[in-house]
Amino acid sequence: MSAPEPKITPELIASHGLKPDEYQRILDLIGREPTFTELGIFSAMWNEHCSYKSSRIHLKGLPTKAPWVLQGPGENAGVIDIGDNQAVVFKMESHNHPSYIEPYQGATTGVGGILRDVFTMGARPIACLNALSFGDPSHPKTRHLVSGVVAGVGGYGNSFGVPTVGGQTRFHTRYDGNILVNAMAVGLADADKIFLAAASGVGMPIVYLGSKTGRDGMGGATMASAEFDEGSDEKRPTVQVGDPFAEKLLLEACLEIMAKDCVIAIQDMGAAGLTCSAVEMGAKGDLGVELDLDAVPTRETGMTAYEMMLSESQERMLMVLKPEKEKEAEEIFKKWGLDFAIVGYTTPTKRFVVKHGGQVKADLPIKELGDEAPLYDRPWVESERLPVIHARDINAPMGAAEALEKLLATPDLCSKRWVWEQYDHVIGGNTVQRPGGDAAVVRIEDGPKGLALTVDVTPRYCEADPFEGGKQAVAEAYRNITAVGGKPLAITDNLNFGNPERPEIMGQLVGCLKGISEACIALDSPIVSGNVSLYNETSGRGILPTPSIGGVGVLDDFTKSATLAFKAEGEAILLIGETKGWLGQSVYLREICGREEGAPPPVDLAVEKRHGDVVRGMIHAGTATAVHDVSDGGLLVAIAEMAIAGNIGASLDAPPGETVSHAWWFGEDQARYVVTVKEADLLAVKTKLKTIGVPCTQIGVTGGHALKIEGERTVDLKALRHAHEHWLPDYMGGKN
C-alpha cells in the first residue's frame, strides 16, 4: 500500500518554486487541486530552466536562420550544413548550481548532459569545450571548486572518449557564491539523417533506454531556477551522479538503432527527467502521452510516481519507436547491456497521463505543460551609461615591461595549462590545434576540412554596457575563429544572469541580447541553439552578466590553419586595426591601477567584418605566418603570448608619438589582430591593406630570446614564461 500523498499547502507550493499566481493559473487550467505528482510536474515544466518564461519573449528577436542552418533553436541542439552531406551539431548548456554544491559531480553531469543533447540528434560527438567562472582566488571555497570542477570535466570527457579542445577560465569576486560551468559539445552527422524530438503517430510505443532510475537529481531543474542562500549545501542530494562509461554504451546503442531506421523521435532525459522528455515529445508532435511507471527500470525500491517523474538520473533516453522495429531495437540495447522498456504510448488526446500501481497519478493538458507554459514580460531598466575614461587621465604606476610581467601572472591572463592538461584533448586523433590558442581546430574525418571552435565572453564589458558587451562577445568569437583561418558560420549561447525579477538584472539580459542579435546579423553568424541560466545569485548578490558565446567555423583545408606562435626570426610584426588606447574596463586598469570603471571599448561590427575578411584572406594566401587577435590585456600581452608560444622574442618600436604609451600597449580596442609576415611579402601586404583602407602598422620584428621594447627595459622570454605559466599551478598547490 502506497503512502498518502502530502497535503497541498502554500508552503509546499512555494517549496516547488511556484508563485501564488502561477498556482492559481494551475487551478484555473485543470479546474481542481493538483495531485502531489501533478504539482511536481508543473514545478518542473514551468520553472525557468525548462520553460524560459522570463527570457522567451526576448529570445524571439535573435537571428536563427541562414541557408546553411538545418535546425535552429527548439531542439536538443542546433545543426548546420558544411557541405558534402556533412552536418555539425552543437550546443552549450549550463550546470551552474549543481557544480557549486558538488563540483565534481556537477561538472561531470554537465558534460554528460550536453553530450547527450548532441548524440540524441544522430551525431557522433567529436569535441567538447567549456567556459568556467570562479570566485576570487582568495575566497576560501575557490580552490576547492576549481579542483572539483576541472577534475569532473576531465573525468567525464576523458572516460567517454571525446577530446576537450578549448575553453575559458576566469576569476572574479562576483562568482564567489555562484560559479558558472558552461559546457559545449560538438558532433558530426549526416546532413540527411538528423533525429528530432517531435513524436508522430498514435499508438506508437514510447521506450525508456539506458540506465536505471534512482533518486539522484530530484528537483534539479527547480533548484537551477532559484537563488542560493546560506543553506544551499543542504541541496547536495539534488545533484545528479554521472557514469561516463554507461553514457558511452548509450551513445553506441543510440547510433546503431538510428542506423537501423528504428526511430520516430528521441529525447534525452535531462532537466526534469522523464517529465520533460515525455511532455516535449508529445507537445511538439501535437499528441498525448500515456506512461505506465510500473514499467520504468529503477535501482531503488519503493520509488513513488513523484520521484520517478522528477528524478534526474543520468544516461537515460526516451524514444518513440517504429512498432515493427521493436524486437530489433530491444536486441541492440540488450547487446550493449542497457535497459530497454516500453513505458507508454502516444495518444490522440493531447493529455499527459501518468499511471502507477494501477492508479492515475497525473492527467494534465500536455500543450500547456510544454510549449504553452507561462510567458512573462518582466519590467526592465536600461543599465546606466558609464563615462568614457581618457587615457591621459590615467597615470601609469610602472613601466610597460614591469606591467606586462605582472599582468601575465594574474588569474585571468595567466596560462590555463594546469586546467587543460587534465583534459584529454587529443583522443580520437583529430585535434589539429590544441587548447591555448585563439580557437581549437579539429579535423573532420579523413578529408581536408576542419572545424574551428571557440568559447568567449567578457563579463566586465557586459556589466558596464550590456549592449556593447553582447556585441563584443560575438565579435570576439568571430575573431578567434578568424585568427586560425576559419570561416565563422554559427553560434550557440549560454546566457548566465542574476534574478530576472529585479528590473536592473532583466535590463542586463535585454541589453546583452540586443547586442548579440545585432552582432550575429552583421557578422552573418546565426544562433542555432542555446541555454538560459537565471537566478545566479546568493543572498541577493548576483554574478556579472555572462552571456557565453560558443562559435563554430569551417576550414576548407585544416593544413592551412594559422596559429599564434611566432614561426621564425626576422619576420615583420604587423598590427591590423586602429588603436585609440581604450583603457576603460581593461585588465590593465583593474590589475595595475586598481580600478574597475569606465565604459568598455565600442564595437564597430562593419570594421570587425572587414578586418576579419582581410586576415582570413592573408591566412588562406599563406602570407600570414602567425596570427593572434588582440583582446584581454591589449597589444603587448598578445605579442608576449605569441613570443612565448613560439619561443622567439621580438624587438618592438615605441608607440606613435601622439599616443599615450600605456594605452598603446594595454588598451583593449576591438577589431585588431597581430600578424607576422615574411620580409619578402611585407611590401605587397602593406600596399594591399593601404589600398583597401585597412589600418596596418608595422610595430616590430621577431627575433632573439627577449622582448625588447624601445624606451623600456628588456624582458627575457624565460621570465615572461615563468610569470605566465606559474600562477595557476602555484595557486592550486597552495603557494599563493
From Swiss-Prot:
Report the domain of life of the source organism.
Bacteria
Offer a single GO CC term for the protein.
cytoplasm
- Spans traversing the lipid bilayer: none
* SUPFAM superfamilies named among the record's database cross-references: PurM C-terminal domain-like, PurM N-terminal domain-like
Ordered alphabetically, the record's keywords are: ATP-binding, Cytoplasm, Ligase, Magnesium, Metal-binding, Nucleotide-binding, Purine biosynthesis
Catalyses which reaction?
Answer: N(2)-formyl-N(1)-(5-phospho-beta-D-ribosyl)glycinamide + L-glutamine + ATP + H2O = 2-formamido-N(1)-(5-O-phospho-beta-D-ribosyl)acetamidine + L-glutamate + ADP + phosphate + H(+)
UniProt-recorded name of the protein: Phosphoribosylformylglycinamidine synthase subunit PurL
Species, as recorded = Rhodopseudomonas palustris (strain ATCC BAA-98 / CGA009)
Starting at the broadest rank, the lineage of the source organism is: Bacteria, Pseudomonadati, Pseudomonadota, Alphaproteobacteria, Hyphomicrobiales
